[in-house]
């Protein structure tokens, strides 16, 4: 019937978004840092950064919840313009940037000043 019908064309129209969500789920399932269950764990491993309006930036530190990654840096730019953030120097694996995500990594970064595009997320992981 027309009320409960599935528009199968939307599967193809939204394939990119669906793939992005699948990678987010894969990232969460593959890393215990994203599955902390107690307030104590969160208090011990979650550190927020001071940011400009429109930005949220935080780190999951010290191999949170037994994760293989020593630190995970997450930056969300909810503003309508690109924003510059400072990432601590080091060897970072780029997990998500500019509307792309890959749980195994998109590339690498040395940290420093990074531009986060408008309405996007940046996820970095430090293994050591």
Predicted regions, residues:
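Pocket-edge structural micro-motifs
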Residues: 59-62, 96, 118, 126
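C-terminal beta-strand-rich structural cap/linker in extracellular carbohydrate-active enzymes
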Residues: 106-128
């Amino acid at each position: 019937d027309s009320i409960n019908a599935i528009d199968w064309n939307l599967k193809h129209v939204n394939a990119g978004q669906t793939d992005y969500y699948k990678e987010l789920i894969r990232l969460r399932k593959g890393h215990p840092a994203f599955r902390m269950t107690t307030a104590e764990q969160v208090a011990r491993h979650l550190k927020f950064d001071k940011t400009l309006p429109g930005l949220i930036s935080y780190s999951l530190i010290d191999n949170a919840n037994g994760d293989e990654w020593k630190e995970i840096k997450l930056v969300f730019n909810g503003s309508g313009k690109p924003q510059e953030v400072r990432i601590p120097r080091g060897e970072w694996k780029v997990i998500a940037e500019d509307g792309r995500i890959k749980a195994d990594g998109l590339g690498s970064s040395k940290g420093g000043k990074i531009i986060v595009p408008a309405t996007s997320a940046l996820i970095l992981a430090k293994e050591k």
